[in-house]
Amino acid sequence: MTTTRTLFKGGIILTLDADIPNLSVGDVLVHGDRIAAVGPELQADDALVIDAAGHIVMPGLVDAHHHMWLGVMRRMMPNVDDLFDYIDVVAEKLGKHYRPLDMYLSTRLTALASLDAGITTIIDACHNSRSPEHTDAALDALKESGIRALHMVGAAMDKEASSAHLPADLERLSRSWNTSDSLVHVGLF
C-alpha cells in the first residue's frame, strides 16, 4: 500500500509550534495524514505538488463544541433572545421528527462546512441520538467527510424520547469506532 505524499510549495507557513519558526515563504510536506517536514525549498520527487504561493498553510483548527445534527437548522432563529425558547423549538418541536437520513445529511453538511473553514478536528456533542440508526447515520456522515471527530452520543431532549438503548449501544459503538486507526471516535455526552 502506498501512502500519498503532498508538498505544499511556497506558502506563508504558520506552524503554531514554538520549536518550528513561521516562514514568510516555505514548504510543508505531508505524508499520509501527518506533517512530515516544514522548511524552505523542500524536495519530494514522488509527491503531489500544490502551489501555495500567496496562501497561508497551517495545521487544521479544532472545534471543541458543536451540535452537528443542527446544521440544517442553522440561522433558523437568528434573533432568539432566550436559549430556552430555542431549545423548545429545536428539541421539542423539530428534533423529534428527525429520521436517520436527516441526521446523516445535517451532520455531513456541518462536517463539510467545518472542513471548508479549516476545522479538521471536531467534538460533536449530539443530543439527538434517538436510536442506534440515528447514531450510525451521524457516524457514517463523519467518516465519509474525512474529518477527525469525537462524536458524543447523547439522549434526545424531547419529552417523548427514550434513552433506554444508549448503554448497550454505546458498548457496540465503542467496539466498532474506538480503534487506533479510526478518525472518528465515540464517547458519551
Task: Label each PLM-derived region with a short phrase.
Residues 128, 133-189:
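Metal-coordinating catalytic core of metallo-dependent amide/deamination hydrolases
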Residues 72-103, 146, 159, 182:
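Active-site gating loops and adjacent loop-to-helix segments of metal-dependent hydrolytic enzymes
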Residues 11, 28, 33, 54, ...:
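Divalent metal-coordination and catalytic microenvironments
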